[in-house]
């Protein structure tokens, strides 16, 4: 049994329930035996007395039947209480042992057209999860191997590789993360997120994506992450309408690097990724803004910013950029005018709580009037 003799708060209750089940089960068996003996006893009488004994036997039988039903019900209730007690008192290791032993019994049975491998795989998955919760990593690894073997024998090789890849990619990413090799960690977290999305494990996929966003911001690869998000959204019917928003955010990350060639190449890639993006106002906005930055045309920069902000406020895109931990800081003079060095900056987009500034060929974003406060440091993306 799963209980150690004399140990545990629930041990006396367990013993009482176990004895009750044994007692009621024995009494049910005795009732059946009494029934058989009474029937044999009636056959020994003469016909007249046999009739009287038969009537007496019918009454006894009805009473015995009712008593048997009551005892069986008591035993059933006791079994349920015992199972509930198991659920309360099972430790993680006990449940692991239970699932693993049950899986082994499934594998040992021999029947034609049997689904023992599928049934054992379900039990081994529960054992694996229990071992992981108990942080018994060696036993969890053994459960993984047995699970893979079950899938192989059940002719589900693809499912086996999916399980192994899902596990290994996440663990490899954590290994690179611990060694501060963030570029490699990003690649494996992206792969793990894809597997989780295929299996519709949204929580785990979001955790992997947050890791990608965190390290992408440290490596100044925010645009890469937003492009990846756009690619995933294209494959989802419910999310495909948000693709242009992701690409807009990715393009604005390129703009903030003041690299016109980079944004031009990025726009070409975005159009290859989503052919409908070329006809959107977001694409036109990025192209016009890149041209204004390249020419250092403040008037054009202001007009383009006002035009897009009047139709679709940029706060959504900027808030997504803020998730990356990007710091947007400017230098203000005593009159709260934005300056770079000693040169006053003129020309800014207005409205929507989001403003764009052009400072010496660099695109700077301001949301919720953050620059009305006096900030004395300037940080690029």
UniProtKB/Swiss-Prot annotation:
InterPro entries: NSF_attach, TPR-like_helical_dom_sf. It comes from the Eukaryota. Keywords: ER-Golgi transport, Membrane, Protein transport, Transport. The keyword Nuclease does not apply. It holds the Pfam family SNAP. It is found in: Membrane. GO terms for cellular component: cytosol; plasma membrane. Gene3D superfamilies: Tetratricopeptide repeat domain (1.25.40.10). Binds to the syntaxin SYP21 and to NSF. This is Alpha-soluble NSF attachment protein 1. The gene is ASNAP1.
